[in-house]
């Protein structure tokens, strides 16, 4: 899967997971637009009669009556928009992925800020990074600083893929509380390894997403054909 196609999948995922709830009308607004009725014999205004005793006009209450809609103001909106319907296969495929892949894609491309996604991403990535470290002994303070970097690496890769500003080494050194020299000697190589973990996660998750979507669409098509037979 080349870079151009990966970007296409990202764009489809952004649209598929966008919050389009504001595009629909509320219940009261819809009711107001469709509340005009033609009652035929009965007038819209309540009838008024003269009270022979007091000489005053009295407004009578009409009983409930059935009616037919005369016209509708505005336009009706479907329960599911065309965009939501056409991108449903992408959402279905995302939800079928493994937890860390699903968490990464939703956090990266749907702007989901759910704490569970962030925890899943960092725990998985830290496990992968520890595997890369192997059995090498690392000082306790260094290990704690590396744990802080794993989440910063996730944010950095997300920003990089979106074309936004990424961290400078001097900025990272300040964030973890080390000198520029210490950063260069101890953390630069490991930082690059962390970012590679997330970049690989992104490409593999997107690839699996397209394969899962294709399989699901093929399965649904076969089911529909079987029903017709």
Curated annotation (Swiss-Prot):
Q: DNA-binding region at which residues? A: 14-32
**Disulfide-bond pairs as recorded:** none
Provide the alphabetized UniProt keywords. DNA-binding, Transcription, Transcription regulation, Transcription termination
Q: Does the keyword Transcription apply?
A: yes
Q: Name one GO molecular function term.
A: DNA binding
Biological processes per GO annotation: DNA-templated transcription termination
Q: What is this protein called?
A: Antitermination protein Q
Gene behind the chain: Q
């Amino acid at each position: 899967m080349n870079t151009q196609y990966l970007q296409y999948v990202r764009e489809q995922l952004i649209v598929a997971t966008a919050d389009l709830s504001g595009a629909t009308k509320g219940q009261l607004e819809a009711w107001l637009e469709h509340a005009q009725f033609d009652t035929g014999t009965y007038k819209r205004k309540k009838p008024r009669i003269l009270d022979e005793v007091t000489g005053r006009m009295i407004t009578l209450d009409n009983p409930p009556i059935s009616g037919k809609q005369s016209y509708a103001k505005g336009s009706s909106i479907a329960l599911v928009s065309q965009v939501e319907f056409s991108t449903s296969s992408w959402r279905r495929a995302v939800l079928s992925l493994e937890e860390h892949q699903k968490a990464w894609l939703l956090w990266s491309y749907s702007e989901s800020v759910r704490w569970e996604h962030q925890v899943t991403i960092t725990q998985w990535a830290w496990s992968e990074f520890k595997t890369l470290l192997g059995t090498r002994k690392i000082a306790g303070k260094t290990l704690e600083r590396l744990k802080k970097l794993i989440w910063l690496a996730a944010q950095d890769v997300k920003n990089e893929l979106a074309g936004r500003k990424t961290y400078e080494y001097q900025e990272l050194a300040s964030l973890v509380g080390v000198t520029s020299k210490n950063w260069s000697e101890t953390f630069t190589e490991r930082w690059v390894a962390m970012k590679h973990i997330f970049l690989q996660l992104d490409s593999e998750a997107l690839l699996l997403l397209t394969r899962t979507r294709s399989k699901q669409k093929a399965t649904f098509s076969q089911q529909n054909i079987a029903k017709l037979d």
